[in-house]
Amino acid sequence: MPPLHSASVSKGIPRMLDPGRSLARGLAFAAWLLLLACSASERREPAAPGPGTRPNVLWVVWDTARADHLDLYGYARHTTPFLSQWSKDARVFDDALSVAGYTLPSHASMFTGLYPSEHCTNNDNVRLDDAFTTIAELFKGAGYRTFLFSANPHIASDPAGNFTQGIDRAEHPWSPQYAEEALRIVRAKLEPEDRSSELPAVLAAAREGRVQLSQGNIKAAGEIAKTATLRWLESSDAQKPFFVFLNYMEAHRPYIPPRRFREQLLSPEDVARSYQVDRSWQQMWEYTFGLREYDSDEIELTRATYDAALLELDDLLRDLLGGLREAGHLDDTIVVLTADHGEQLGEQHMLDHQYSVYQAVLRVPLILYAPGRVTAGHEARPVMTFDLFPTLLELAGIKKPPGSRSHALSLLAPQADRVRFAEEPATPKIGIEQVAPLHPGWDPSPFRRRLRTLIEGSHKFIWGSDGRHALYDLAADPHETHNQIADQPELAAKLASDLDRYFATLDRCKMPSHPHDRRQLTPEQQELLKGLGYIEENKRDPRKP
């Protein structure tokens, strides 16, 4: 079995590669590198800092935050007033895409600089293999102290996900020292009249001792992340620079922004109505599958509630950075703000962020704050979130592993003509499994497919494993409402061919013979994932007693 030889160097554990592709893949990758060399003449190389002058790194992920709902990116509602002001001293990337539309593959790609088809971490295999060297391992190896706080159980719950490779300490809102405070925070967010999700019933069960851990803890990341980070910074070795990664889940469903944030965006009448729209998982899946409807007012109230959650995140970021600055921890610190993916909010008759590679789930915020290292301003050239892997290493003066290769590029010199690729490599099963028993005769096959997309300039081609493809002109149709594949067959054929050639350059992995699926998680981890819709609650109709 050949050793690992992609962007992340092998750690002595052989990686499962697909035999028979090596020569073709190598030639394709060589051709891609030649094109890259020809277009990188304007590359800016900052002076590599010495070991004693390496910057700190604070990397914040707003889980499920889509770029076009931030006023920083031109949105009509003022959802991010602090971020808009703070980012005036940062580089704002106006056209940043994630490599995938959900947590597992997108985080694994940011951590390794690899595409999902190269690391094989997805809905069918929830574990990031030890064979891949993560960015945290590289920072730790360069003398950094490393910390991770995540409200997303997939990222924080080891050994299941294995995302904490290279992390000195990993914490989460259900850590024993924070669990009680997390429940208090979440209960304070909920109103007695809230009928929008399953969360009030879950918290009631937690109060009565019928569940050991509450799904609601994931919604308390903001306040606790600040406390946990400050405590760790004060207790760890201050002689070493730090690498801190934080994941916030306030914008992930269930949406429970406190009333004060709803009141800043909605009329009193709409604030009251926002608590009454049924956004339980069953209802949202049925809507996505075309089995039920929301009226236009319900969709708009869903969007407004999501926007209020973004406003809450903005306030939490202000509090986090203020606390770190007051404690003296922002001196010579690079700050990254991005998202792992976005959210469907009624577009294409979809909610949540599964079964999709549309812009609503791929286009995310990306802000890089590094005064003295990166020039402030807006950057319009196309980039991707896994570009953070080589960029942060470069800014810290840390060398990439010998022999590594990757399609991830430095954010310090974006390419105007860059071709971008994203994918949904494994069919999400949870929605189908939850809905099918309640709808005998329903055919879920249109949703049982893998998706890939290639974007060249304004043209976006979507490939479906079931033979249903799509073509959009993002300049004229940014919301992807008009499929042009029948109108422009020649362009569609060209982009399909380009996608095939691009996909051939990937150092594709093979799924493990015994993948780590969610059935192997502990009961506590499964309980948390139920709150995110990642694990089925039960198959009875929640509308019936």
What does each of the following model-derived ranges do?
Residues P3, L36-P545:
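Catalytic domains that recognize anionic headgroups
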Residues L4-L27:
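Bacterial N-terminal signal peptides that target proteins for export
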Residues G26-A37:
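Bacterial N-terminal signal peptides
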